[in-house]
Amino acid sequence: MDLIQTLEQEEIARLAKNIPDFAPGDTVIVNVNVVEGTRKRAQAYEGVVISRRNRGLNSNFIVRKISSGEGVERTFQLYSPLIASIEVKRRGDVRRAKLYYLRERSGKSARIKEKLPQRRVVSKAAAE
């Protein structure tokens, strides 16, 4: 590991952010710290993760939502001090890493199936 990678790992450890596991297709709520004049407040941004880029300290993700009938996308830096928290609301079942095709879709065709938790199969021998 070279010097830059070591410094990035130390910075990530110093930030000690609680980042949940999420992937493209998941619906997340990102609470963003917004400064308006002298006031500071948290603003919730809820949408579907359409992309995630894992690059250590430079990791980011794109969240897409429909606001007043218009598609709005916002890119967040994963380790940004502006992000107060990230909450996974719903897991999505998709087969792609980048869901850019959702940009051309609207309505029912833009829906994403929910990933249900795996059911454990109990054999008859173990049940007896």
Curated annotation (Swiss-Prot):
The record's GO molecular-function terms, alphabetically, read: structural constituent of ribosome
Task: Kindly list the GO CC terms recorded for this protein.
Answer: cytosolic large ribosomal subunit
Q: Does the keyword Ribosomal protein apply?
A: yes
Matches recorded under Pfam families: Ribosomal_L19 (PF01245)
Disulfide bonds, paired cysteine numbers: none
Q: Does the keyword Nucleus apply?
A: no
Q: Which superkingdom is the protein from?
A: Bacteria
Q: Which UniProt keywords apply?
A: Ribonucleoprotein, Ribosomal protein
Please, one GO biological process term?
translation
The UniProt entry, under PROSITE patterns, shows: RIBOSOMAL_L19
Which family does the entry's similarity section mention? Belongs to the bacterial ribosomal protein bL19 family.
Function in brief: This protein is located at the 30S-50S ribosomal subunit interface and may play a role in the structure and function of the aminoacyl-tRNA binding site.
Query: This chain belongs to which protein, by name?
Result: Large ribosomal subunit protein bL19
List the source organism: Herminiimonas arsenicoxydans
Taxon lineage: Bacteria, Pseudomonadati, Pseudomonadota, Betaproteobacteria, Burkholderiales
Q: Which gene encodes it?
A: rplS
